[in-house]
């Protein structure tokens, strides 16, 4: 018994299952098609089917509304091309995290992981699953809203199922993503084809004088861009799993080049389809635009719309879990989270502890009554980190010239995206100042307290608490440390 104690005390440096192979690591099982499906499947969630009215409400006219949707697609593509350079230059999973680490050091990277892992990503995951559960439960409660308890229980079950699938197998998770992406493209095709047929039949009244009454103020345009970009969010998801991409130098940029323009074309055509059967006023009054479209165009087969929207939301939730779990994994590997979160399942070769942690935090977020306001105020932080990351790309052009760049975008692209990101961060604060933005900034900065206590100084008492927890979780989950951080 006495001989085993020292081995347990050294578990942070060496696995307690020290006879495991040294090559335990994430496997490269995501190809080009799966990469495109992850991008398309994560971007196209419930937003384009339920609330495209948010862009219209700020532009007040059909013409500017369609221009905003196109502009958001172009901006997403430009941002993703910058991330393609970063992803092929620094071939590590974790999205913005390793890029901020290389460009600016550990503190900005830690603050990104702190705010992303505890608020932005799990709360978004929870909202997507709540949206899915509402669509599933509503048909069983005709004439009234489904009980909150039912919706939350279904959302918790969805989170548990998605977490389990992605913990079991990378390949299974990507197959599930491919299936749901195909399903959502079916409903996208149905809406687009129906709209084009109606357009060919002469339903063009809503496109006449399409710029009349347009709102062109800075505040209105910034809010319209915010709402449009929310529907495009997910364009950087493939960078979270770079280490699992086959031939990332080829497949990462190709998936971006094919995936995001495809989404952009779909979004514009879907909006055109909506306007063939609804006036701007009717669209603004609709609670679920795609359902209204289905009732008017697809009856008596209109039931397929909520079914496929449910498929779309669960696909977006799966893509979010698949990629965000890797951020937890990389943060744990760098010592910015509990070490056990960076461990890999011996049997499944998945970052199971990271995915399970992400699922638990997301489940906590479905308990409160309304978390939309929290996410809305943190959405500006998303573009804060996007802008900071792309600024890091510009900085590394001068400070890290020795790094190989298989893809090198023209310098004006990251400069343009950085300026737009700064505009998106500052515009809502200036045009509609609120204390919540200050609270958001204070929360992000509060991560510094935990950074210096648990990461920088590494107090002995914290290590004594974490070591036995890590050891027991490692034995319970049959996980081991990964290979050394790829350089």
UniProtKB/Swiss-Prot annotation:
<feature type="topological domain" description="Cytoplasmic">
    <location>
        <begin position="326"/>
        <end position="351"/>
    </location>
</feature>
<comment type="function">
    <text>Mediates the electrogenic exchange between cationic amino acids and neutral amino acids, with a stoichiometry of 1:1. Has system b(0,+)-like activity with high affinity for extracellular cationic amino acids and L-cystine and lower affinity for intracellular neutral amino acids. Substrate exchange is driven by high concentration of intracellular neutral amino acids and the intracellular reduction of L-cystine to L-cysteine. Required for reabsorption of L-cystine and dibasic amino acids across the brush border membrane in renal proximal tubules.</text>
</comment>
<keyword id="KW-0812">Transmembrane</keyword>
<feature type="transmembrane region" description="Helical">
    <location>
        <begin position="148"/>
        <end position="169"/>
    </location>
</feature>
<keyword id="KW-1133">Transmembrane helix</keyword>
<keyword id="KW-1015">Disulfide bond</keyword>
<dbReference type="GO" id="GO:0015804">
    <property type="term" value="P:neutral amino acid transport"/>
</dbReference>
<feature type="topological domain" description="Extracellular">
    <location>
        <begin position="432"/>
        <end position="434"/>
    </location>
</feature>
<keyword id="KW-0029">Amino-acid transport</keyword>
<feature type="topological domain" description="Extracellular">
    <location>
        <begin position="194"/>
        <end position="217"/>
    </location>
</feature>
<feature type="transmembrane region" description="Helical">
    <location>
        <begin position="303"/>
        <end position="325"/>
    </location>
</feature>
<dbReference type="GO" id="GO:0005886">
    <property type="term" value="C:plasma membrane"/>
</dbReference>
<feature type="binding site">
    <location>
        <begin position="43"/>
        <end position="47"/>
    </location>
    <ligand>
        <name>L-arginine</name>
    </ligand>
</feature>
<feature type="topological domain" description="Cytoplasmic">
    <location>
        <begin position="1"/>
        <end position="31"/>
    </location>
</feature>
<feature type="transmembrane region" description="Helical">
    <location>
        <begin position="352"/>
        <end position="370"/>
    </location>
</feature>
<feature type="transmembrane region" description="Helical">
    <location>
        <begin position="63"/>
        <end position="84"/>
    </location>
</feature>
<feature type="topological domain" description="Cytoplasmic">
    <location>
        <begin position="392"/>
        <end position="410"/>
    </location>
</feature>
<feature type="topological domain" description="Cytoplasmic">
    <location>
        <begin position="239"/>
        <end position="251"/>
    </location>
</feature>
<dbReference type="InterPro" id="IPR050598">
    <property type="entry name" value="AminoAcid_Transporter"/>
</dbReference>
<feature type="topological domain" description="Cytoplasmic">
    <location>
        <begin position="85"/>
        <end position="110"/>
    </location>
</feature>
<dbReference type="GO" id="GO:0042605">
    <property type="term" value="F:peptide antigen binding"/>
</dbReference>
<feature type="topological domain" description="Extracellular">
    <location>
        <begin position="275"/>
        <end position="302"/>
    </location>
</feature>
<keyword id="KW-1003">Cell membrane</keyword>
<feature type="region of interest" description="Disordered">
    <location>
        <begin position="1"/>
        <end position="22"/>
    </location>
</feature>
<dbReference type="GO" id="GO:0015184">
    <property type="term" value="F:L-cystine transmembrane transporter activity"/>
</dbReference>
<dbReference type="Pfam" id="PF13520">
    <property type="entry name" value="AA_permease_2"/>
</dbReference>
<feature type="topological domain" description="Cytoplasmic">
    <location>
        <begin position="451"/>
        <end position="487"/>
    </location>
</feature>
<feature type="transmembrane region" description="Helical">
    <location>
        <begin position="170"/>
        <end position="193"/>
    </location>
</feature>
<protein>
    <recommendedName>
        <fullName>b(0,+)-type amino acid transporter 1</fullName>
    </recommendedName>
</protein>
<dbReference type="GO" id="GO:0016020">
    <property type="term" value="C:membrane"/>
</dbReference>
<comment type="subunit">
    <text>Disulfide-linked heterodimer composed of the catalytic light chain subunit SLC7A9 and the heavy chain subunit. The heterodimer is the minimal functional unit. Assembles in heterotetramers (dimers of heterodimers) and higher order oligomers. Interacts with CAV1.</text>
</comment>
<dbReference type="GO" id="GO:0015811">
    <property type="term" value="P:L-cystine transport"/>
</dbReference>
<feature type="binding site">
    <location>
        <position position="233"/>
    </location>
    <ligand>
        <name>L-arginine</name>
    </ligand>
</feature>
<dbReference type="InterPro" id="IPR002293">
    <property type="entry name" value="AA/rel_permease1"/>
</dbReference>
<comment type="similarity">
    <text>Belongs to the amino acid-polyamine-organocation (APC) superfamily.</text>
</comment>
<keyword id="KW-0597">Phosphoprotein</keyword>
<dbReference type="GO" id="GO:0031526">
    <property type="term" value="C:brush border membrane"/>
</dbReference>
<feature type="topological domain" description="Extracellular">
    <location>
        <begin position="138"/>
        <end position="147"/>
    </location>
</feature>
<dbReference type="GO" id="GO:0180009">
    <property type="term" value="F:broad specificity neutral L-amino acid:basic L-amino acid antiporter activity"/>
</dbReference>
<feature type="transmembrane region" description="Helical">
    <location>
        <begin position="32"/>
        <end position="55"/>
    </location>
</feature>
<feature type="topological domain" description="Extracellular">
    <location>
        <begin position="56"/>
        <end position="62"/>
    </location>
</feature>
<feature type="modified residue" description="Phosphoserine">
    <location>
        <position position="18"/>
    </location>
</feature>
């Amino acid at each position: 018994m006495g001989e085993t104690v020292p081995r347990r005390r050294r578990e942070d440096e060496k696995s307690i299952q020290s006879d495991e192979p040294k090559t335990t690591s994430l496997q490269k099982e995501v190809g080009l098609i799966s990469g495109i499906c992850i991008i398309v499947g994560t971007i196209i969630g419930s937003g384009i089917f339920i609330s495209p009215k948010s862009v219209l409400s700020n532009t007040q006219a059909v013409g500017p509304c369609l221009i905003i949707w196109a502009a958001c697609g172009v901006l997403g593509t430009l941002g993703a091309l910058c991330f393609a350079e970063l992803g092929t230059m620094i071939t590590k999973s974790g999205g913005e995290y390793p890029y901020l680490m290389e460009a600016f050091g550990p503190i900005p990277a830690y603050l990104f992981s702190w705010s992303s892992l505890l608020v932005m990503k799990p709360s978004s995951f929870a909202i997507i699953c709540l949206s899915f559960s509402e669509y599933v439960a509503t048909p069983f409660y005709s004439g009234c809203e489904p009980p909150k308890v039912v919706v939350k229980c279904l959302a918790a079950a969805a989170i548990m199922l998605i977490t389990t699938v992605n913990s079991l197998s990378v390949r299974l998770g990507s197959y599930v993503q491919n299936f749901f992406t195909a399903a959502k493209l079916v409903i996208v095709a149905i809406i687009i084809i129906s709209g084009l047929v109606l357009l060919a039949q002469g339903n063009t009244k809503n496109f006449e004088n399409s710029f009349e009454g347009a709102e062109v103020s800075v505040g209105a345009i910034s809010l319209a861009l915010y709402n449009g970009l929310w529907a495009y969010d997910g364009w950087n998801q493939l960078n979270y799993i770079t280490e699992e991409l086959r031939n990332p130098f080829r497949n990462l940029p190709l998936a971006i080049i094919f995936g995001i323009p495809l989404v952009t074309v779909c979004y514009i055509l879907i909006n055109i389809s909506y306007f063939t059967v609804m006036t701007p006023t009717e669209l603004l009054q609709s609670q679920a635009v795609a359902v209204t479209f289905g009732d008017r165009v697809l009856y008596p087969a209109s039931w397929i719309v909520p079914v496929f929207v449910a498929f779309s939301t669960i696909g977006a939730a799966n893509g979010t879990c698949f990629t965000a779990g890797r951020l937890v994994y990389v943060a744990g590997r760098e010592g910015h989270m509990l070490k056990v979160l960076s461990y890999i399942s011996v049997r499944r070769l998945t970052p199971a502890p990271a995915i399970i942690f992400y699922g638990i935090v997301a489940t906590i977020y479905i308990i409160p009554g309304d978390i939309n306001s929290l996410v809305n105020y943190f959405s500006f932080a998303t573009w804060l980190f996007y802008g900071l990351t792309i600024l890091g790309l510009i900085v590394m052009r001068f400070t890290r010239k020795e790094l190989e760049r298989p893809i090198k975008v023209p310098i004006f692209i990251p400069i343009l995206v950085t300026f737009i990101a700064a505009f998106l961060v500052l515009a809502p604060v200036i045009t509609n100042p609120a204390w919540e933005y200050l609270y958001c900034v204070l929360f992000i900065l509060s991560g510094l307290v935990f950074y210096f206590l648990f990461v920088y100084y590494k107090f002995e008492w914290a290590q004594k608490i974490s070591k036995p927890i890590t050891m027991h979780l490692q034995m319970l989950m049959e996980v081991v440390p990964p290979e050394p951080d790829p350089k």
